[in-house]
Amino acid sequence: MTQLLRFLLILSIFCDFSHSQRPTIRVGIAAALKTQNGSIGWAYAGGAVPLALQYLKSHGFVKDFDFEFHVEYTECDLTETVRAGLDFMKTKNYDVIIGPPCATPLIAMGTLSTVYKKPVLGWGFVSESEFSDMERFPYLTSVLPSSMTLGTVTSALLELYGWDRIALVYFKNELNYCSGVIEDVETSLYDENYSQMVQVVIKEEVDQNNTENFVATLQMIKARARIIIFCAQTGAEKRFYMIQAGKQGMNTSEYVHVMLSMRSVGFGVQSAVGKKPLNSGLAPIWEAFQVAPDGLEDLAKSVASKMLVIDLSSDIRDKEFLQYMTKNIVYAIREPPLSCMAPECLAANATGMGAYARHLFDVFYMYGMALTNLNSTDPNIYGNVDLLVSKFTTPFEGMTGQVQLNSELSRLPLYQVYALNKEYDQISIMNISLINGTAKVSLAYQNESSDVWHFWGSTRPLDTPICGFLGKSCPIPFFDQYRLLIFVFVIVAGLLILAIFTCLTSMVRNQRAEQSRLNSEWQIHAIKLRIPEKKGRRLSTDSENSTVTKSSKGSSSKNFETSEFNENYEIQFLENDLVLTTAHQVQELSNLDKMRLVKLRKLDHENLNKFIGLSIDGSRYLAVWKMCTRGSIQDIMSRGNFSMDYFFMFCMIRDIAEGLNFLHKSFLRLHGNLRSATCLVNDSWQVKLAEFGLEFLQDDEERPTQKRLLWAAPEVLRGSLTVSQMDPSADVYSFAIVASEILTKKEAWDLHKRKEGYEGKRGNSKIEIIYNVKKGGPHPFRPTLLTDSDVNKSLLALVKDCWSENPEARPNTENICKIILDMTPRTKDNLMDHVFSMLEEYTQTLEVEVDERTKELVLEKKKSDILLGRMLPKQVAERLKAGQAVEPESFDLVTVFFSDLVKFTELANKCSPFQVVNLLNEVFSNFDAIIEKHDVYKVESIGDGFLCVSGLPNRNGVEHIRQIVEMALGFLEFCDKFRIPHLPRERVELRVGVNSGSCVAGVVGLSMPRYCLFGDTVNTASRMESNGKASLIHMSEIAHAFLVDHFPYQYETNSRGEVIIKGKGVMETFWLLGRISMSNRSTPPVAQLKQLPQKCSSFTDTGTIRSVSPYIENASDSEDEELRRVMRREMMRVS
């Protein structure tokens, strides 16, 4: 690149030599070779002149001119500047002078230019406002604006953010650049045209070499200001300021450091070295680019984040040439036409260029443009300075941005205020231009908090801290000042919020609870539903006229013949009540569906079947309806065994119309599924509509059966309409079909008897009917109304109007109800009155029949009581009838009677079975008559045997022996007089045995209960009978003693002597001969018995307890023979 530049410069010189006739512009340059190398040093800035000349020629300027340059190193010395100026202007008469780059020497050079009328091009530290005085310096011009404009821009920034308390800090150096800038800024702040009064609390000049003094200044600023405006000439001074401010803790969000600059560098420095360059291509000022790394970059960076920079706009269009200029400026100065061979020029390297090199470039470029714009071939015209200077006002794009001078040869500046974004790259937050000395601010951000003050906590800093600069003037915190009020307010607000929250929570809870309660009303758990047990075809037995019977206690004793109920329903138990259920597919229920179910459950009308709820937790949805015990109209018609008169049918039709009218006026709007199967009948023969309002639930069947379509209106069949698409007139058509079923007392369309085929062919009658209905036409297909003669013709006409082919021609339900009301017979109010009037006709007949049956019942009860009393003791029978248990009872002393007909077997052989029965019946009947005259209980009679007892179950003291004796005598007296009709020569003889003692009595058995006696007394009485003689009363010793002791001299007895009794041994027994006053009988032939020895053999009876019906042994001839054998053996042994 260096070789190329050298070639281009030499080539341009040779080309210029080839045009010896062109005018030569002689340029005198007052430069500073050893002063401020980083800013105005000739080694780092002088190369801008040949580069500007090259740039002019590349853009078509100064083609007709040759240039001759003469450089004098006046540094910034006033004497050397005056000497060089006189030499340039007076002695050598140069056309234009450049420099010097310092303010004070430039004043002298400008004064000489006024005297000698030579244009002077100023650059470097020449921003003082006095250079704008055209009367004093008419030929001095510069591309740097006046520092007074910087003061105006600073004032505008302070006014924008409301800062009126500031500190001014500037660095001291040999050129006094910052002191002039600060003076102009301060002058602008106190300008009378400035509306905001700004207080400068501190104005201090600091020195980079005096750190202690600088720190003291910062300490004073901390105590008095938070908005600090400072001016630093070099990058090192800027970084020094940031480091020291950071060390003093001035990098918090309270501080704003405003840096003033007029070099178009912003947060950058003119250096080619940088770790991370800014978007302007310059190195950031916080980097240690001129010294060795010191580790303080982060500290400096923290202060930079709290900094704003006011600088000239750096919007350069030809950035590519600027980069070229930056890299080659130190090489260009060594080449012709300057050919600087000074050690400083030769030692310069490509680390960067001087800060004011771009201003030197622009001011020479402006001069070249002015020369060209004179547009004249007269060489003398270029000596017209006034005309030349007037051309300086032509605007152009330079290396410092847009350059435009006003009529006073002062640049019209465009300032920008820079800040750092979150990535620490500089951004322009506003543009400030000057129009007629007035600042015009143009903001470049949308949100001040986030775009400008993000490093300040998104809050604009104040010029005075709230708590003062020393933190001792903090206002009393609001909480401390109003603690009591706040405490009370918090409590009240808390209670209020708590109350509001409680109310809202309660409202929400109540609303949810109410919704849950409403949902629980229609939700029925599947576990509550159960299918009743079926016994055959019936659930239980009941009358033919009723399907459900409730007991008087209101229990669920219900029964129903399931085969006679419509197949659409399933009968189940809900708790203890029978209900009807319809099955539906499981699906998701929306909130609207749930609200519909709540409304549906509340729907109530006397002609609507009550919807109880929906079971949704089973394998299928079950809609639960109230049980209507008589089934549906379809069920009644299908049974065919019920007779209805006209009024009965009329009332049913009226009930259907009333229920349908109510539905049409409700939120449901229509029924949509009206059929005879959905018209249910309750106990009172009242019709109730069912299966309405659940069209959003899908049935188990995917599509309606053909039978259901028999009730559908023609327009519904043609369009396959859903319930939501139907019109109420479709219900009116269905009502007419149901009414035709009732009037004809037949199933819809008389389906079971239809035999015609479709188009002459035999086929499905349902399909034919549906097809004919859909077909329509002028004579639509309808059911035949063949009714009884007593049916009102107007009612038939109404039915025909209701099934009209045109839906609009059908009457609505309200008109139907009015027409039916007009047809109601005046003598009858309702169906139940009609039924009651029919029942009254049977009332009297039923009452007479009930009375007769009641009398018969009483009579039969008496008979049964008498019969039961004969079979069991009265008190025992009463306890058994009451369902009480009869405990066995022990009796201390009773008398037991046994009897037997002597030689009954021989007698029975002479008689037929019927004669035997008649004989026993006559004898025992007389015996029963005799028993009734005495206090004796007949235990039983088995065959010809007879068992009686006295003293139980009614205790009668000692009277029992006399009652048995009197009864026995009565039996003998009857037998003595009794004659057998068919055997007159035969006699009935009785053998009697009597014994007294203790006994146990009780009831044995359940199916045929018997009152039985237990104990040895009974066995002994039986032995007395079996060992007795015909027509004699054989008594035990105990019975005899009891009779003689208690009833002496009343009865005649005779000792039989000792007798061997089976199971008892030898016992002394007695004969009862009769009453003493009445006894004329001879003593029985028992003398031989008295001769028996007193000592007899004993026989042991192993069975001492007899059964209820003891076996009575026949002790007649065989026993006598055995007795004789025993007597003989004893007599022989004694002898």
From Swiss-Prot:
<feature type="glycosylation site" description="N-linked (GlcNAc...) asparagine">
    <location>
        <position position="209"/>
    </location>
</feature>
<dbReference type="GO" id="GO:0004383">
    <property type="term" value="F:guanylate cyclase activity"/>
</dbReference>
<keyword id="KW-0325">Glycoprotein</keyword>
<feature type="glycosylation site" description="N-linked (GlcNAc...) asparagine">
    <location>
        <position position="431"/>
    </location>
</feature>
<dbReference type="GO" id="GO:0007168">
    <property type="term" value="P:receptor guanylyl cyclase signaling pathway"/>
</dbReference>
<dbReference type="Pfam" id="PF07714">
    <property type="entry name" value="PK_Tyr_Ser-Thr"/>
</dbReference>
<dbReference type="GO" id="GO:0004672">
    <property type="term" value="F:protein kinase activity"/>
</dbReference>
<dbReference type="InterPro" id="IPR011009">
    <property type="entry name" value="Kinase-like_dom_sf"/>
</dbReference>
<dbReference type="GO" id="GO:0005524">
    <property type="term" value="F:ATP binding"/>
</dbReference>
<dbReference type="InterPro" id="IPR018297">
    <property type="entry name" value="A/G_cyclase_CS"/>
</dbReference>
<dbReference type="InterPro" id="IPR050401">
    <property type="entry name" value="Cyclic_nucleotide_synthase"/>
</dbReference>
<protein>
    <recommendedName>
        <fullName>Receptor-type guanylate cyclase gcy-4</fullName>
        <ecNumber>4.6.1.2</ecNumber>
    </recommendedName>
</protein>
<feature type="topological domain" description="Extracellular">
    <location>
        <begin position="21"/>
        <end position="483"/>
    </location>
</feature>
<feature type="signal peptide">
    <location>
        <begin position="1"/>
        <end position="20"/>
    </location>
</feature>
<dbReference type="InterPro" id="IPR000719">
    <property type="entry name" value="Prot_kinase_dom"/>
</dbReference>
<keyword id="KW-0675">Receptor</keyword>
<feature type="glycosylation site" description="N-linked (GlcNAc...) asparagine">
    <location>
        <position position="349"/>
    </location>
</feature>
<feature type="domain" description="Guanylate cyclase">
    <location>
        <begin position="895"/>
        <end position="1025"/>
    </location>
</feature>
<dbReference type="InterPro" id="IPR029787">
    <property type="entry name" value="Nucleotide_cyclase"/>
</dbReference>
<feature type="glycosylation site" description="N-linked (GlcNAc...) asparagine">
    <location>
        <position position="375"/>
    </location>
</feature>
<feature type="domain" description="Protein kinase">
    <location>
        <begin position="545"/>
        <end position="837"/>
    </location>
</feature>
<feature type="glycosylation site" description="N-linked (GlcNAc...) asparagine">
    <location>
        <position position="37"/>
    </location>
</feature>
<keyword id="KW-0145">Chemotaxis</keyword>
<dbReference type="GO" id="GO:1902074">
    <property type="term" value="P:response to salt"/>
</dbReference>
<feature type="glycosylation site" description="N-linked (GlcNAc...) asparagine">
    <location>
        <position position="193"/>
    </location>
</feature>
<dbReference type="GO" id="GO:0006935">
    <property type="term" value="P:chemotaxis"/>
</dbReference>
<keyword id="KW-1003">Cell membrane</keyword>
<dbReference type="InterPro" id="IPR028082">
    <property type="entry name" value="Peripla_BP_I"/>
</dbReference>
<dbReference type="InterPro" id="IPR001054">
    <property type="entry name" value="A/G_cyclase"/>
</dbReference>
<feature type="glycosylation site" description="N-linked (GlcNAc...) asparagine">
    <location>
        <position position="447"/>
    </location>
</feature>
<keyword id="KW-0456">Lyase</keyword>
<feature type="region of interest" description="Disordered">
    <location>
        <begin position="535"/>
        <end position="560"/>
    </location>
</feature>
<dbReference type="GO" id="GO:0005525">
    <property type="term" value="F:GTP binding"/>
</dbReference>
<dbReference type="GO" id="GO:0006182">
    <property type="term" value="P:cGMP biosynthetic process"/>
</dbReference>
<keyword id="KW-0547">Nucleotide-binding</keyword>
<feature type="glycosylation site" description="N-linked (GlcNAc...) asparagine">
    <location>
        <position position="436"/>
    </location>
</feature>
<feature type="glycosylation site" description="N-linked (GlcNAc...) asparagine">
    <location>
        <position position="251"/>
    </location>
</feature>
<comment type="similarity">
    <text>Belongs to the adenylyl cyclase class-4/guanylyl cyclase family.</text>
</comment>
<feature type="compositionally biased region" description="Low complexity">
    <location>
        <begin position="546"/>
        <end position="560"/>
    </location>
</feature>
<dbReference type="Pfam" id="PF00211">
    <property type="entry name" value="Guanylate_cyc"/>
</dbReference>
<dbReference type="GO" id="GO:0001653">
    <property type="term" value="F:peptide receptor activity"/>
</dbReference>
<dbReference type="InterPro" id="IPR001245">
    <property type="entry name" value="Ser-Thr/Tyr_kinase_cat_dom"/>
</dbReference>
